[in-house]
Amino acid sequence: MKILFTNDDGIDSHITRELYETLSAEHEAYLIAPAKDKSGQGAAINLRTAVDVVKLEDKIYSVDGTPADCVFMGLMAIMDGLPDIIISGINKGANMGDDVIHSGTLGAAFTARKMKLPPLAVSIAGRSFENYQSSILATKLMLEYIEQNYSDAPQDRKSVV
């Protein structure tokens, strides 16, 4: 699968980087994340401000913008062709209840869905993020499930959050 990864914790999030490295071994993956933490930005985008994009490594980009900006930049300026799925996370925080309207993780997923692309948003609940490897495994298993069960589904039926 061709995957666009983003998050709201920023390009330096070791959890997102490890997820990217795990899945890029088997998939064509791009990591396009905010230059710094943009938690709480929801689906906000920069309308009247230039958004700088810096290529850090092959298929890894830092965007001076929000998680939703990262999705737009990936689709319109960075990636060659559309991704099969956009994965947002793994977020440090639960993203439950009223928090969902402010979540940058979910904002990126909502933006992907608005662009008619399937999103997968992943968050970790709890006070400690030391055991994040189980979330990486869960994401990998979800992606395998999606590949096996939704690859032939119509585009408008591929939303997973």
Predicted regions and their residues:
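A cross-family phosphate/adenosyl-ligand binding-site feature
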Residues: 3, 13-77, 81-82
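Internal, conserved structured core segments that host functional sites
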Residues: 81-126
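Short, glycine-/small-residue-rich phosphate/pyrophosphate-handling segment
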Residues: 120-149
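Conserved small/polar residues in nucleotide/adenosyl-binding loops
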Residues: 160-161
